[in-house]
Amino acid sequence: MQTLFLSLLAAAVTVHAYGSGGSNWDQAYSRAKDALQKLNQTEKVGLVTGVKWMGGPCVGNTYKPESIDYPSLCLQDSPLGIRFANPVTAFPAGINAGATWDTQLLYARGAAMGAEAKGLGIHVQLGPVAGPLGKNPNGGRNWEGFSVDPYLSGVAMEKTIRGMQDSGVQACAKHWLGNEQEHYRDTISSNIGDRAAHELYVWPFMDAVKAGVASVMCSYNKVNGTWACESDALNNKLMKEELGFPGYIMSDWNAQHSTVNSAVSGLDMTMPGSDFSNPPGSIFWGSNLEAAVADGSVPQSRLDDMVTRILAAWYLVGQDQGYPPVAFSSWNGGKANVDVTADHGTVARAVARDSIVLLKNGHGTLPLRKPKSLAIVGSDAIVNPAGPNACSDRGCNNGTLAMGWGSGTAEFPYLVGPLDAIQKRAAADGTKIVPSATDDPTAGASAAAAAETAIVFINSDSGEGYITVEGNLGDRNNLDPWHNGNELVKAVAAASKNVIVVIHSVGPIILETILAQPSVKAIVWAGLPGQESGNALVDVIYGDTTPSGKLPYTIAKQAADYGASWINAETDDFPEGLYVDYRHFDAKGIAPRYEFGYGLSYTTFKYSGLWVNMDASAGAANGQVVPGGPADLFEVVGQVSVSVRNNGRVAGAEVAQLYLGLPDSAPATPPKQLRGFQKLMLQPGQTGRATFKLTRRDLSYWDVQQQKWVVPSGTFKVYVGSSSRDIREEGSFRVRRGW
């Protein structure tokens, strides 16, 4: 098997990537090097070593030097808001942000999160998430990321990071690399093939680095037999040399395993500084690192490089200019002395609303038109009676599901439950509500029988492996709805002729039992919508907004169709290679239930006028390395466009999607891969033009012999449509043999 970094040497190096960075990084490095000269050795070590768990107000804190005007750095979760603080906004999860396929909303969500972090004095917000990518559909933390597709995930990473850092907080791209399951995450070795690593798992991190991300977090697992946080191949060779990353690499909390090896292999900051329980010998850096530099085990230049990278990131986002002090403590209930939420609930609602995916809509069941009566069935329709924050880190499944569990969470300032929002709308419409906020099938059937239409709420939860919920150790045990959701739907469908199913889930669930019920006329996926859950749902099911979300993953007919799942072992050889999610379904000829990129609307769209203009030559990318990779890899070499017309009677947004098929001269490759998308908002009868700019990277595959990105020669296939399988326009272009 070809393994990651096959041809790379194991020798430790000190990498200086800043010389090839953009002007902002260059200026930041100039200032960082000046500051470095003023620090003594103990202060340098203090900048790269956490003060220990609960040693400061944040989940991660560094020592404050006296020689320069630089703070104790505050590092804080999470990728969807601020953990352990209130009041803050509980935004929709990453998987919902990805399902919007909306670059403006992705940026706005990142900017709002960054503004709240800065307002609380947080220097580093621990997100966004590119790993797990989500190769295992039941992986526990998939929902923290944006999509199983690396292109969509990469765009979302770029927009989110730019939004966060434009607001003044340092972003942290995580988890680097191969952290695809929670079972055995502290011991498992992710043995990833070199090509699959680059084309799938590294790809969105390239976009993060290109966007100027300040920091990267290495993961708990091993990669090809070496701990991720002390892998020279992973951190020095790939991240810092190949991707030209000028920022710093921090450990996940307690993911460090050594003093010298981690230092010389590219780790720049250790968190939280000591083990949670702080046993003797658990501090790998601090005085131990200072001693290792003194005896020559770690070069002085390596320590100076760590510090320079950390200082440069601080200068890069302007945190030296009037940055607020830390305004909360994670350990006393998180009550902040400032309110940073502003109007961010509006952003949260927009993301939640535009991420909703309409999976089925038989007989125009939706939108609702002032029904005389509605049965609202299922515990997922209401807020946890004990309160939305009753379970630490959301480690329970009681009431409506609006985020998964673990460190990637935030405290709800409020949570609008679906029943509450529907009742408010129903009161205005004169609709009678018949509630059954329980998962008991008999009670649900009774409520449904007394109403014109029944809406059944079901869910499926997951999270981080340090919490087990209902027997699920982070990863989901299966892809079925929780709390006997299938039986609940069957009972309601037997009692009602008009059933709508709403799904709150961390990822795909198998829907065959539900679809087998003739009375189920509509199915809505609402994901993990955050604090504005009910309001966003009402916006869509009542037709105030036309649904425009698209699936960020495939929904299969049976779990076995995915060809991947978390494994009960300490080694994962990633046997699926490149063939993950729709790439696997396409290559194997497996019909999904709902394909990647799928989503219905209340209107219809017609595609026409495909236009392709290409000026690319075959060959390898050989340009100077800039943040993200070789500069020529990101050159625009072509353009594809298509017209999209709204043929319906209501306004709606359509996500036009571009997929490419590589020529036969390329080694075995999935039949098609996403390489562009654009969301168009169109009034009835209006035509818009979707335009996709293609770079050399979009046309390339990773050549394991050359260790370069290569554009193959021959005929490329062009597919444009409404999903990965609903292709409306096809074309092709040829790439000549060249440089």
UniProtKB/Swiss-Prot annotation:
Record flagged with keyword Hydrolase: yes
Pathways per UniProt: Glycan metabolism; cellulose degradation
Reactions performed catalytically: Hydrolysis of terminal, non-reducing beta-D-glucosyl residues with release of beta-D-glucose
Keyword terms of this UniProt record: Carbohydrate metabolism, Cellulose degradation, Glycoprotein, Glycosidase, Hydrolase, Polysaccharide degradation, Secreted, Signal
Residue positions with a glycan: N40, N224, N398
Pfam families referenced in this protein's UniProt entry, alphabetically: Fn3-like (PF14310), Glyco_hydro_3 (PF00933), Glyco_hydro_3_C (PF01915)
Catalytic center residues: D252
Subcellular location: Secreted
Class of enzymatic activity (EC top level): hydrolase
GO molecular function (one): beta-glucosidase activity
The enzyme's E.C. designation: 3.2.1.21
Keyword Signal listed: yes
BP term (GO), one: cellulose catabolic process
Function description: Beta-glucosidases are one of a number of cellulolytic enzymes involved in the degradation of cellulosic biomass. Catalyzes the last step releasing glucose from the inhibitory cellobiose.
Sequence similarity: Belongs to the glycosyl hydrolase 3 family.
Name of this protein: Probable beta-glucosidase L
Organism: Aspergillus fumigatus (strain ATCC MYA-4609 / CBS 101355 / FGSC A1100 / Af293) (Neosartorya fumigata)
Upper lineage: Eukaryota, Fungi, Dikarya, Ascomycota, Pezizomycotina
